[in-house]
Amino acid sequence: MSPLDLLDIFEGHTIARRKLRDELQLFMKGERSVEKYREAGISWWDYCGSILINSYPTYFERLPSLIEKINREKRCSKNYVLFLGETGAESNQVPCLSLVQFQIEDDGLVLSAYQRSSDANLGLPADIYHLYLITRQIDLPLKSITLNLGNVHIYENNIDKTCRLLAGEEGVRFDLNV
């Protein structure tokens, strides 16, 4: 996706921008308390109990220092990588996003990511927006974001709503499947 494609998506469609920005900030602070997300108006982690165990905050808390390193070094001969997840680790929500790679090419940022699993209606748009927000913290113009998807699915409880959205209906809201 080009930066203009992303801008069109995020400005032309309804997504929970503020909540997703707040969520990313909490992830990057390493906040594991579900109550803190609730205080920010984010209720989609409630099903995990009171604490997020080996989930996004566990790994995203490494992101600020990685971003600082990228901004300081800006080495085109090096790919900077954030890995999310750990094989066999106990978790109440394994991160769907598994790897984010930052590459500097011709004085611009190329971001590549791998997502192991993705709810097409809720998780995928949220993760794309998070990636976009992350790129804005790097002091380089964005050249592209490439997202490789291992599994994309639509949950049964959202099939009718997906059809309505694809038919052009506006304001369709999707339900979590937990």
Q: What kind of region is each of these model predictions?
A:
Residues 1-178:
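Terminal, non-catalytic protein-protein interaction segments that mediate quaternary/complex assembly
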